[in-house]
Amino acid sequence: MPKLKPGNKVPDFTLRDPEGKDFHLYENLGSMKTMLVFYRGDWCPICNVYLNNLQQRIAEFRDANTQLIALSMDSPTDAWNMKQRLGLSFVILPGLNKEMIEAYDLVYNEKFHYNEPAIFIIWPDGTVAFFAITSSSLGRPGVEDLLSIVSSI
């Protein structure tokens, strides 16, 4: 049974963005829904395609009053390079650690030391509205499905 489920508050966190600024989750919730996109890393081609697909529909997420935040165990340099290469306009947070992975009940690949993908859509008060945790690079909710979810809640 997952630790986090709809109605539970997500753990707060502080991570440094690729530009070196501290990002505090709860200070940035505001009045919008927030979609946390946990991805494997810049090295994962499927993650790159997925993040690019999210970027292509960013205006629709904003129209659905939803901000996107992508998180990984990447280094700040790798995260910055990926953000620039893909032209991502949403927040990218590198430096995800094992404590956060455990707090969010994500699948962790012990052999290669990275988290598997997950999506958490949270309300402005920090409670979970929807989540999907995968155990491999495949099986993530499609962008169209995510837009349908954020538009209907």
For each predicted feature, which ranges?
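Chalcogenol-based redox active-site neighborhoods
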Residues: 1-153
